[in-house]
Amino acid sequence: MAANEYDYIIVGAGSAGNVLASRLAEDADVTVLLLEAGGPDYRFDFRTQMPAALAYPLQGRRYNWAYETDPEPHMNNRRMECGRGKGLGGSSLINGMCYIRGNALDYDGWAAHAGLENWTYLDCLPYFRKAETRDIGANAYHGGDGPVHVTTSKPGNNPLFAAMVEAGVQAGFPRTDDLNGYQQEGFGPMDRTVTANGRRASTARGYLDRAKARPNLTIVTHAVTDRVLFSGKRAVGVSYLHHGNVLNAQARREVLVCSGAIASPQLLQRSGVGRSTWLRELDVPLVHDLPGVGENLQDHLEMYIQYECKEPVSLYPALQWWNQPAIGLEWMLNGTGIGASNQFEAGGFIRTRDDDPWPNIQYHFLPVAINYNGSNAIRMHGFQAHVGSMRSPSRGRVKLTSRDPNAHPGILFNYMADPLDWREFRDGIRITREIMRQPALDRYRGRELNPGAELTTDEQLDSFVRMRAETAFHPSCSCKMGYDDMAVVDNEGRVHGMQGLRVVDASIMPRITTGNLNAPTIMLAEKIADRIRGREALARVDTPYFVANGVASRKRESATV
């Protein structure tokens, strides 16, 4: 075999690409090339390794592509942040470390589409378990020996977590002890991708650490893939930039595009696979007219409902520079303390209406008042709920703007384009205010800081959303799986109309899942890895899961409104 020839070439060492690299390299008779545009995941860089420092990578460009959207027409024409991970681990290197799998009905919904029948929740659950090591042990829902370490919430954490969960229950919503178990719906503790010694459990740490010493796996960082190379309709390799040089690598079997929901459609389009009219605008030679590439883009939008805290128990002191050396030292030496947690240790999922079949609103509770990216910190003790709708009907697109591989694409999520979006965000604000008025928070709850208690009408709440809602950093669905005219890949990630080419990442989701996307992305990569290797899929299980079936979304007689 030539030095630049491999059986598989994987483009993107993120949440999916690292899974594929590790699993494919388990077969000693194949060779794998893993290309990553960013650098290593430096283990001594607290910005990516300390869970509490999660805002730092979003503030620079070493680990963040720092995309911006086109002006969003329903959001006061704001150009909105669209951070994506750069470096070994991809977005698992810079995300919030919330381990949320989604709702069982998300996957049953995928499987309701013709040709996707093998994507039910009970087909996917074995792969969630395969990927996971949960710190309190395995059960029917959780794994005990997978590459991704999952930490559960422990006694003695910030008292605001328990108070906010209890307030949700007092407002009439269910309590759940496991947001990834039998019943996602309700309020409860949140699992996190954090190791036993308080480090971020990215897919680089979980998967590549197991695989990188294998002689059949080659990892190249600072490698910006320009385009996929084709012979007719077959992918035969890639061209990439590395330290100023243009290099080609040949793929004997397949090219696997794992660059994420923004960069995967961009790479396909730059390579000549996409909507022909878009490609002609930039004189990109057409390889295959596939109009769904870059379409169907989805995300979660969220807002911060913030309150003053009357007792000095919030994390506000940890934001003061003079307290941070001690926090960092405890974390570095012992892997404990404030630094060892992402501080998203409680949350929930609710249905805002009884006729919603599964939760349409997600909560993350945070014992400090601050933006996700570390900006706009409130200079007092405070706490907040991150509140966002889960399955917006609004759809956007990713569109190539240049043949330059270093140029950013045009990104439009088209946030809040549907009347349902506005109804759900108004409901979310009003329900959150009910939760915050419950007795469990009486000793902590001060005045409402944002949106502000004076904002009550639909028009006032809508204005707040337009000005203040932000991305939850969950882009997806832009190379969707399926068999309709706008589908890009089949049920195993193979690009329609092509040979030797797959897309495997969050872009192939037909519809966004209910919650954070890291765990589902790892799962789908595990599942497709078996198919690439020619292995039988793990057997469908019969584990029970909750379905509301018209049950009331809350017990209103118990709530303080």
UniProtKB/Swiss-Prot annotation:
GO biological process, one term: glycine betaine biosynthetic process from choline
Keyword annotations of the record: FAD, Flavoprotein, NAD, Oxidoreductase
Protein's pathway: Amine and polyamine biosynthesis; betaine biosynthesis via choline pathway; betaine aldehyde from choline (cytochrome c reductase route): step 1/1
Active site residues according to the UniProt entry: H474 (proton acceptor)
Residue ranges of the TM segments: none
Binding-site residues, FAD: 7-36
Pfam families cross-referenced by the UniProt entry: GMC_oxred_C, GMC_oxred_N
EC identifiers of the protein: 1.1.99.1, 1.2.1.8
Catalysed reactions listed for this entry: choline + A = betaine aldehyde + AH2; betaine aldehyde + NAD(+) + H2O = glycine betaine + NADH + 2 H(+)
Protein family membership: Belongs to the GMC oxidoreductase family.
Function as written in the Swiss-Prot or TrEMBL entry: Involved in the biosynthesis of the osmoprotectant glycine betaine. Catalyzes the oxidation of choline to betaine aldehyde and betaine aldehyde to glycine betaine at the same rate.
Name of the protein this chain belongs to: Oxygen-dependent choline dehydrogenase
Organism, scientific name: Paraburkholderia xenovorans (strain LB400)
